[in-house]
């Protein structure tokens, strides 16, 4: 009798353990379901607010274009940071950046071939502001090969399909302009440390074209919004022209025309004649901007970068990407 009672007791304990395990699993699964539901709701809220911030940025840029100013500068309303503000139980913030204050990677190569001014400028940025063990000549040559349509290795330092097909995973060169600066991470000789150091100075934008003839035009950097580091790499990269330009903007306000910029540079360098203006791709206007947005709802943080092109009469979103940097 006692033996049967012992077996029954063990059976009851096993059943209780199984029921307790099932109950715990149900509770855990319910908690996960609640968390998933909350994340979905917060994700939808965050996305809607990021798109609302995009609309805010577009309106700010449109209003700026309506002003009777030729130049774009960091003194204007669009350059002000939108601080974190409460919205529907969350926190949102935003900022507009002038992408034409950066070096456009796609200027290194165009249909006319290698742009020596752009080639020299990017090499200078890599030499001065990235890791000591970086190989600027190899990276810039690899960028030329990444964009150009042929399979000829540039300067015997670049890389074409055969160099990347042996990688794991294997891939090929794009043979087109970059769609994002992050494509630089695919280049031979590039690593994350070098890329992170270079990122504040670069962008990847479409090359401007002539509406009448469809020809590629020269990409211009906005002197009023460019960094001192980038400006110092223009020209032959040996004279501190960039520092002088930044000081002049701080002292007298933004430049209002390309002619004014070139006259200042010519006077600073004390060049009386044969001044090569092509070495100074500078202007005072901007057409490309990045609206950086951030939203926090619950435990979820969502960030989006919106690359926009502003024309004389319209504005359009070229790309949206999630993440901190584009």
Residue ranges and their predicted role:
Residues 2-326:
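Compositionally biased linear targeting/interaction segments
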């Amino acid at each position: 009798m006692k033996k049967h009672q012992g077996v029954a007791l063990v059976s009851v304990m096993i059943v209780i353990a199984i029921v307790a395990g099932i109950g715990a699993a149900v509770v855990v699964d319910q908690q996960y379901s609640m968390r998933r539901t909350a994340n979905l709701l917060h994700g939808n809220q965050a996305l809607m607010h990021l798109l609302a911030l995009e609309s805010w940025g577009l309106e700010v840029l449109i209003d700026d274009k309506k002003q009777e100013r030729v130049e774009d500068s960091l003194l204007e309303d669009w350059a002000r940071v939108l601080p974190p503000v409460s919205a529907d139980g969350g926190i949102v913030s935003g900022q507009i950046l002038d992408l034409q204050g950066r070096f456009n990677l796609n200027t290194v190569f165009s249909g006319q071939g290698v742009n020596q001014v752009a080639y020299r400028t990017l090499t200078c940025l890599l030499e001065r502001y990235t890791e000591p063990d970086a190989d600027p000549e190899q990276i810039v040559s690899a960028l030329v090969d990444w964009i150009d349509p042929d399979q000829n290795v540039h300067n015997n330092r670049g890389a074409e399909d055969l160099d990347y097909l042996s990688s794991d995973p294997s891939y090929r060169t794009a043979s087109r302009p970059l769609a994002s600066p992050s494509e630089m991470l695919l280049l031979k000789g590039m690593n994350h440390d070098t890329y992170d150091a270079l990122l504040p100075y670069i962008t990847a934008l479409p090359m401007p074209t002539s509406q009448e003839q469809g020809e590629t035009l020269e990409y211009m950097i906005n002197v009023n919004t460019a960094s001192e580091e980038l400006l110092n790499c223009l020209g032959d990269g040996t004279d501190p022209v960039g520092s002088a330009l930044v000081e002049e903007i701080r002292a007298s306000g933004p430049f209002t025309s390309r002619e004014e910029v070139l006259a200042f540079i010519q006077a600073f360098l004390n060049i009386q004649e044969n001044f090569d203006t092509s070495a100074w791709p500078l202007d005072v206007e901007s057409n490309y901007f990045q609206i950086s947005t951030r939203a926090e709802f619950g435990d979820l943080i969502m960030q989006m970068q919106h690359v926009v092109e502003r024309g004389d009469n319209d504005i359009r979103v070229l790309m949206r990407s999630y993440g901190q940097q584009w």
